[in-house]
A protein has these predicted regions:
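A glycine-rich helix N-cap at a beta->alpha junction
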Residues: 43-50, 91-102, 182-187, 436-449, ...
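Thiamine diphosphate
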Residues: 1-133, 161, 224-225, 248, 379-516, 526-527, ...
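Short helix-loop-beta junction
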Residues: 37-43, 242-251, 478-484
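Short acidic, glycine/serine/threonine-rich loops at helix termini
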Residues: 34-37, 60, 81-85, 107-114, ...
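Flexible, low-complexity linker and terminal segments
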Residues: 1-8, 17, 130-348, 353-354, ...
Length: 588
């Protein structure tokens, strides 16, 4: 059956058709939907793990047991999972093991623009890179075959545009491979130094065999053109190149980007008057081509940063190569439309429970070390509350170092903020360090009862699993106390006075402390909202105090405040800032 599918949904379909049995992932845009779609297949057990390292180790355990398994994450998640990645390259697999990493060129929702192809090279594992939804489905099945044939984990590299665009997929039935029997093999699976030394030559031999496979695999293909011009490309860049040049140039479309096909590249280059490599981010393919002695152009004319587009490629290549300008012709430009559309910067939603807390921190002129999640938006004006955001869990570790460096000077005004899901991901070890090494630090856990920014996924503190069924629930207060924190306070962020008192008290304390700011995300379906507030125009003096919250439901028209009833959820936080009492509920 032919279906129009999102790239991530197609990859999940490929897992199903390829006989996957176990999926363990951590949500992260743009990878999240793969696991959310996989859970819809009854034949696949799916779960959200506390972090990417746990997810990969879980998937490896399932592979060890003889089942085909999968774990998914965004690009920065592979940093977290790097430890098991490098060693399971040595151990190899039993059942097929796929690791999906979704890169984010242009950083639509990420803190960096790293290129995950380097991980495949460094870990010496194969990497496949689909260019549309159909390939996402087919490459998943191919990855399992490669994994089991070559005794290796396989990385599938997605990117934002492939993950979140749609194309036609020809769906097929499910393959049900038999469970491979588990056999104890200490030399293969127990990575003591002696065994690891023996396994390293296997990794090198496997890489050589994979390189030969890449030369003949249908994952890589040549599309011949009418001109003696060759373009080597992959993923999204392939789609742009095809749209610009049609059949005028020859294209080597790479679906397997590690190891790269040496012989195929050399053969493709023969007879070409001009050879280009078109790839987003780092010059991985270009560097390899140059190591083969090929004269190629790439990052000398194309940017190292951000996403490509057909317009960008047409402009850059036409300017650099007059011959290409003749072939490109006129490309309809979407830039004018982009320039005319007003910007819509991300903001915390109306009724967001984090807003009241950040207002309190801003009012108290706190130095705030932030973390990864919806609450990162607290850095935006008018709250402008966050001073640092690095990576998952870094706020808790960083405040320890910050306060150890500055002592009492910072202890009385510095806090760390971290979400409930992020705390479970990688904040606990930082808190253990605070308790163990006794820094007088205040950590605020923003507990909104969900993993919010990636689309409302469950986590170990919610009490529900990926299917919404009841599951084990970790109590944050008990956990913090068990880790050695004696001062644990819970506040409602809608109660500004309580927040203010808690912040002042804990900053004044002479020992480590935790404040749990607890209220469910305003967008959760079970959260009941109050009627929208209204503005008494006679009482409103236009002081703009309500605007200090940065709530999207509040605006100024003329000199008076206005509330958008379609957005307001009646949280009442703004009314607590309005001294004239102009903001209130509708009175009958």
């Amino acid at each position: 059956m032919r279906q129009l599918m999102l790239g991530n949904k197609a990859l999940a379909r490929g897992l199903y058709e390829g006989g996957c049995s176990i999926v363990s992932s951590y949500p992260g845009t743009p990878s999240t939907e793969v696991t959310e779609e996989a859970v819809k297949f009854e034949e696949i057990y799916c779960e959200w793990a506390p972090n990417e390292k746990v997810a990969l180790e879980t998937a490896f355990g399932a592979s060890l047991a003889g089942k085909r398994s999968f774990c998914g994450m965004k690009h920065v998640g592979l940093n977290v999972a790097a430890d098991p990645l490098f060693t399971c390259s040595y151990t190899g697999v039993n059942g097929g093991l796929i690791i999906c990493v979704a890169d984010d060129p242009a950083m639509h929702s990420s803190q960096n623009e790293q290129d995950s192809r380097h991980y495949a090279i460094a870990a010496k594992v194969p990497m496949l890179e689909p260019a549309d939804s159909a390939e996402a489905c087919e490459f998943a099945k191919a990855a399992y075959e490669i994994s089991e044939e070559f005794d290796t984990p396989v990385i599938i590299r997605m990117c934002t545009r492939i993950a979140h665009s749609q194309s036609i997929v020809d769906t097929k039935g499910r393959v049900c491979p038999p469970t491979k029997p588990y056999e104890k093999n200490v030399r293969k699976y127990v990575m003591t130094p002696a065994n690891a030394i023996a396994r390293h030559p296997f990794v090198e031999e496997r890489t050589a065999r994979l390189a030969e496979f890449a030369n003949t695999s249908s994952l890589n293909r040549v599309e011949k053109g009418s001109e003696p011009i060759g373009i080597i490309t992959s993923s999204t860049s392939y789609q742009y190149v095809k749209e610009i040049f049609c059949d005028h140039v020859s294209i080597l479309k790479l679906g397997m980007v590690n190891p790269l096909p040496e012989k195929l590249l050399l053969d493709f280059a023969k007879g070409k008057e001009l050879l280009l490599v078109v790839e987003e981010l780092d010059p991985v393919i270009e560097t390899y081509c140059k190591s083969l002695g090929l004269s190629v152009h790439g990052k000398d004319v194309l940017p190292m940063t951000g996403e490509f587009s057909q317009n960008l490629l047409a402009e850059k290549l036409s300017k650099a190569f007059p011959k290409l300008a003749e072939l490109i012709g006129t490309i309809p430009s979407g830039r004018k439309l982009d320039e005319e559309i007003p910007g819509r910067p991300p903001v915390m939603c109306a009724g967001c429970p984090h807003r009241g807390l950040f207002y309190t921190l801003s009012k108290n002129k706190c130095t705030v070390l932030g973390d990864i999640g919806c609450y990162t938006l607290g850095a935006a004006a008018p709250l402008s509350s966050i001073d640092m955001t690095l990576c998952m869990g870094a706020s808790v570790s960083a405040i320890h170092g910050f306060n150890k460096a500055l002592g009492e000077e910072s202890e009385k005004r510095t806090v760390a903020v971290i979400g409930d899901s992020t705390f479970m991901h990688s904040g606990m070890t930082g808190l253990a360090n605070i308790a163990y090494n006794q820094s007088n630090s205040t950590v605020i856990i923003l507990d909104n009862s969900i993993t919010g920014m990636t689309g409302h996924q469950q986590n170990p503190t919610t009490g529900y699993n990926i299917k919404g069924d009841p599951a084990g629930k970790i109590d944050l207060e008990s956990l913090c106390r068990a880790m050695g924190i004696r001062r644990v306070t819970v506040v409602d962020p809608y109660d500004l006075d309580a927040c203010d008192r808690a912040v002042k008290e804990e900053l004044a304390a002479t020992e480590p402390s935790v404040i749990i700011s607890r209220r469910p995300c305003a967008l959760l379906k079970y959260v009941k909202h109050k009627p929208a507030l209204v503005v008494d125009q006679e009482k409103c003096v236009g002081c703009r105090a309500c605007m200090k919250l940065g709530c999207p439901a509040i605006s100024i028209r003329g000199k008076k405040a206005m509330i958008d009833a379609t957005q307001c959820v009646g949280c009442g936080v703004c009314s607590k800032l309005c001294r004239p009492g102009a903001l209130g509920e509708v009175t009958k």
